[in-house]
Amino acid sequence: MKAVVFAYHDMGCLGVQALLDAGYEISAIFTHADNPAEKVFYGSVSRLAALAGIPVYAPDDINHPLWVERIAQLAPDVIFSFYYRNLLNNEILKLAPHGAFNLHGSLLPKYRGRAPLNWVLENGENETGVTLHRMVAKADAGAIIAQQRVAIDPEDAALTLHKKLCQSASQMLEYALPAIKQGQTQETAQNESEATYFGRRKPEDSFLDWNKPATVLHNMVRAVADPWPGAFSYVGTQKFTIWSSRVHPRVNAAQPGSVISVAPFLIACGDGALEVITGQSVDGITMQGSQLAQTLGLVEGSRLNSQPVCTVQRRTRVLILGVNGFIGNHLTERLLREDHYEVYGLDIGSDAISRFLTHPNFHFVEGDISIHSEWIEYHIKKCDVVLPLVAIATPIEYTRNPLRVFELDFEENLRIIRYCVQYHKRIIFPSTSEVYGMCTDKFFDEDHSNLIVGPINKPRWIYSVSKQLLDRVIWAYGEKEGLQFTLFRPFNWMGPRLDNLNAARIGSSRAITQLILNLVEGSPIKLIDGGKQKRCFTDIRDGIEALYRIIENTGNRCDGEIINIGNPDNEASIEELGKMLLASFDKHPLRQHFPPFAGFRVVESSSYYGKGYQDVEHRKPSIRNARRCLDWEPTIDMQETIDETLDFFLRTVDIVEKSS
């Protein structure tokens, strides 16, 4: 029987050897290149394959169509996965007529997902095991072919349990693989009601919170003991790792995290105390507990921390280019509300941010990003987070000035992106909902929707493709050079200070500002191509709160993510927006100061925007990533946004224009 194998780690080696021993013909093995940042203590699948004369590959993306085609050409009868770290898509799974099988390190359906070895120890389980199961689209959910139990002894830590699981897996494969080959398997469906799932472990999962019981912390030490990265704590700002420990009953009333004694090195916990048997300072060597306490300068009564304690907390420096714009000025207001941000801003005007100019944590320079390149480079080096918000983002300019759109939106921003790469700075880049173009999906999804634009002779797409190419450049810099980034895509944000009425007079504004100008001047509201195009309108306060959470980046959850920020519940056509705005206008206390409503007028897009324009019928965001990364949900109803936006502009007109 001809097999294609996906394998890594010790389990990968023993799986490959078991297949060879069972008489399988292995056509190819797919594995991973070792990560230099990872401590490699396990066997090499690639070396084993090479010694056995089997072709071996380590692709970056096994699910790429080219690799799927190459696997199809191998014509496998069966597919096996032994601790391969990437999910295989359905296109690969269906290539094997006798099925695809995966070796998992737990007693499924318990502990599906990543790192079951570590999670069972941390959770204090006394039993785990190994499972061979069919592979289906849902991870670790297929029917069970074989299963073997493994007892977890109190003295077991990660490495000893790993060795037990490897031994048990070898025994199980010895009888399971011939059964698969002979078509004599007995399969048991998994009970979904009993399923549990655990994700990839993150560094913060190994923080030792001294408020927890000593038993819980001891289990955490066991779960990530050497050669895993280890459980850790801090003495002030100094990090140290505990490699092995022992639980003691509480011997006094010390506060959690207090050092009860240094010989033995005993630390008070929420319940009981933890004795450090062996440990290591961040730049030191492994040593026994009492020596470690001495090395760390600890005495009885010293306090430990779960997080580093800094005597002086420097404010996070945020550079906003285009700080006077709609998003920039609202974001500045939100950041300055907190005392831990310092905002540096550049723009060609300051009318929208004049209220911040005297704030001690706000630093502004009036200037043009195409001229002030030295200032920009210096402040990118100086700041922690960079938001390049400068762009031409009004549709009429895409057809009126396409080259200027390209020069500013693409070329100037590319220079800023490269500075961020050069100086290792985090960039939060404003992509746009425009990148989805004429996508036909019901909900536009950051990770799966196609980005579809029109022909070259439609210059309205120059903004969309400029932004899309920058998205791709940033993504590539993240993948290849470690750029820390987040892309966010606003969906029709509205609110006070969106454009201004002077911009609307020359057609260079967003839809609602243009409609308000029509009402203020008593001119007809123009409905481009009938105004049936639908958009999802988002209140600026909802949008800014999401953007603020991206800047906060709790748990680094936003790194490398693309995040739609919009309100899918606030969907309306431009015609409906105009009618809602008219109703709000008629109820406004300043209504009497303005001319009568001049009605709606349907106009062709070519006569308004020019011959190079194309419109999009609908644009509704999926906000799955925003919910997952930001714990964010839009809350403000569209009518409230319309009322407040209209009120802001009408009062501006009354104060400024009517008095002139």
UniProtKB/Swiss-Prot annotation:
Residues at which NAD(+) binds: 347, 368-369
Binding site for UDP-alpha-D-glucuronate: 393, 398, 432-433, 460, 492, 526-535, 613
GO biological processes: lipid A biosynthetic process; lipopolysaccharide biosynthetic process; response to antibiotic
Disulfide partners: none
Residue numbers spanned by region Formyltransferase ArnAFT: 1-304
Keyword field contains Ligase: no
Active site: 104 (proton donor), 434 (proton acceptor), 619 (proton donor)
UniProt keywords, alphabetically: Antibiotic resistance, Lipid A biosynthesis, Lipid biosynthesis, Lipid metabolism, Lipopolysaccharide biosynthesis, Multifunctional enzyme, NAD, Oxidoreductase, Transferase
Claim: Cell membrane is one of the keywords in the record: no
Residue positions binding (6R)-10-formyltetrahydrofolate: 114, 136-140
EC number of this enzyme: 2.1.2.13, 1.1.1.305
One Pfam family it belongs to: Formyl_trans_N
GO MF entries: carboxy-lyase activity; UDP-4-amino-4-deoxy-L-arabinose formyltransferase activity; UDP-glucuronate dehydrogenase activity
Catalytically driven reaction(s): UDP-alpha-D-glucuronate + NAD(+) = UDP-beta-L-threo-pentopyranos-4-ulose + CO2 + NADH; UDP-4-amino-4-deoxy-beta-L-arabinose + (6R)-10-formyltetrahydrofolate = UDP-4-deoxy-4-formamido-beta-L-arabinose + (6S)-5,6,7,8-tetrahydrofolate + H(+)
Dehydrogenase ArnADH: annotated segments: 314-660
Function: Bifunctional enzyme that catalyzes the oxidative decarboxylation of UDP-glucuronic acid (UDP-GlcUA) to UDP-4-keto-arabinose (UDP-Ara4O) and the addition of a formyl group to UDP-4-amino-4-deoxy-L-arabinose (UDP-L-Ara4N) to form UDP-L-4-formamido-arabinose (UDP-L-Ara4FN). The modified arabinose is attached to lipid A and is required for resistance to polymyxin and cationic antimicrobial peptides.
Family: In the N-terminal section; belongs to the Fmt family. UDP-L-Ara4N formyltransferase subfamily. In the C-terminal section; belongs to the NAD(P)-dependent epimerase/dehydratase family. UDP-glucuronic acid decarboxylase subfamily.
Subunit structure, interactors included: Homohexamer, formed by a dimer of trimers.
Protein name: Bifunctional polymyxin resistance protein ArnA
Gene: arnA
